[in-house]
């Protein structure tokens, strides 16, 4: 057998139908942890779709994993430490270790905000990114 695996996450307009996450507290409609369906262990990927006005509702940071967010559709914002940036189709954001992050789909977005998050570290990634530190005592930046 060759060293590859394949899955199909469907067209963009079907992403909202999936219900998933890493742990029960962050499991939600519109999230799919794609790497749980693949055989690799050093790169992770998730596909997410938020409705207009929907937000993560929490911040998080990583101590050993970098993330790259590739926004495909919709209008949104990312909170990155003490900054807020606008994101839209074609925006690519690399977030290094130690940076707090959160995101939302703008209330006036004409479509769902859809993006891929690619995670990688210098060590094999666990199925649940156990280096994530939820930060619940800081309000959303919007």
Which functions belong to the PLM regions below?
Residues 64-66, 70-76:
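Glycine- and acidic-residue-biased ligand/ion/polar-headgroup-sensing regions
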Residues 29-33, 46-63:
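Conserved short histidine dyad/triad with adjacent acidic residue
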Residues 102-142:
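Double-stranded beta-helix
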Residues 1-43, 128-142:
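A short, N-terminal "cap"/entry segment at the start of jelly-roll beta-barrel domains
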Residues 82-97:
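Short acidic-glycine-tyrosine-enriched beta hairpin
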Residues 45-49, 68, 92-94, 102, ...:
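Conserved hydrophobic/aromatic beta-strand scaffold that supports enzyme active sites
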Residues 40-43, 51-55, 75, 121:
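Short, charged/polar surface micro-motifs in flexible loops or helix N-caps
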Residues 58, 78-79, 95, 101-108:
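Short beta-strand His + acidic residue motifs that chelate non-heme Fe in jelly-roll/DSBH
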């Amino acid at each position: 057998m060759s060293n590859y695996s394949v899955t199909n996450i469907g067209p963009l307009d079907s992403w909202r139908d999936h219900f998933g996450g890493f742990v029960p507290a962050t499991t939600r409609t519109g999230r799919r942890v794609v790497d749980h369906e693949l055989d690799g262990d050093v790169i992770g990927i998730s596909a997410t779709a938020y409705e207009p006005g929907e937000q993560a509702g929490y911040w998080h940071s990583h101590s050993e994993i970098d993330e790259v967010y590739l926004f495909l559709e919709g209008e949104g914002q990312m909170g990155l430490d003490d900054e807020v940036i606008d994101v839209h189709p074609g925006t690519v954001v690399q977030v290094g270790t130690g940076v707090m992050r959160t995101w939302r789909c703008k209330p006036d977005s004409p479509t769902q905000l859809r993006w891929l998050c690619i995670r990688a570290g210098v060590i094999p990634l666990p199925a649940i990114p156990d280096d994530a530190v939820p930060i619940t005592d800081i309000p959303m930046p919007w």
